[in-house]
Amino acid sequence: MTTQLYLLAVLFALLLGLMVGKAWERYKLRDGRWIDRRRLRETPHYMLGLNFLVDSQVDQAIEELTQAASTDTDALEIQMILGNLYREKGQVGRAVNVHQQLLQRPDLTTLEHAYVLLCLGLDFRHGGFVDRALEAFQEVLVLDPRNRYALINLQKMYEDQHQWSDALRVREQVAKVDAGRRPEDQQILGFLRNEIGSVHQRAGDGAAAARAFAEAIDVDARTAPAYLNLGDVRERQGDLSGAIEAWERLIEAVPEHGYFAFDRLERAYRMLGAPHRFVGLCERLISGDPQGWRPRLALSRHLSAAGQHRAAFDWLLEALPHHPHGLAIHQEIWETLSVLGFEPGLIRRYVELTREAVFYLDPHVCRRCRYRSAELLWQCPQCHEWNTFVEERTARSKEVAAEEIGLAGRG
């Protein structure tokens, strides 16, 4: 009998705990009264507002969420969303007022306080109030030291101010929070160290610059500008062999960006009295990447400088099918044709390959925000992300290219 009573008491305690937990999940005590958390979400305005928000219809979302908030003025999450929407519409002052009013609530939890401060920091950053935004993000980190969003925004603000050491310090904190789960951390750390090296380089401190560039490469072997800059520092220090070693490592580590080192290597090989090394380099790259147009273009320019214009023209026609829309190739072809006296046969070969080509001046595009640029940029000026530019190419099929080359040869 005693055992049965004991089991009954345990069961009753479990049921009571479950009921209390459900009640705590649904209701919240605020200002001496219980608030039904579900009531807010059951209003049609709340759901409509979220749907409009998903569809990026900001004005309609604001209207519906304002209606939803009117049924319960204490709804923290809706007030936060409304403030953020005001910011997205450019109404920064209104967003700041909403979020500052939320901070006046005496019953905010630490987590709620941190996220309202985060929203306020975003308001200030959007409005260009740099100092106040920095202060807000730093206050978030006092409450929540592992808040990744605050850390990222703090890093970006330091980058905007070119405070690279501070940006690096904050990104290292982000990397600790991520604990190796995000490979872009190492990439960004590498680029930030490269920027620190560039600051030393401009200040004339070659030794410190070289250390920073080497550290950037150690952190992420694909930090392409660090190889270029390290080679430049070594060249200024009189270490031409070391400079060549750095530039050649770039081609091995990041072959798609190796063309940045072509002019440097061509000059360095010539200074060593071994221009044939550049020809060999280009031929190896062409062999390793049959569709690579940049090594072909570089080799043609090298041959033109040596007076071998017809051989240079042949390499240009080889490059063209792999990148028919690249303006640089066409400009080089016309310069070479000019030197060769505009021979009709050469012009016919060129016309056959370019019949459907479209030229453009900004072939590089950011993968994140689609910003276009005439040159490859290491950091996007619009979304401020690192190493997001790729070359937009509209190459034709190998079969068509091969057929056209065959026709050209018969012509």
Please state what every model-predicted region is:
Residues 43, 77, 111-115, 149, ...:
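Start-of-helix register in tetratricopeptide repeats
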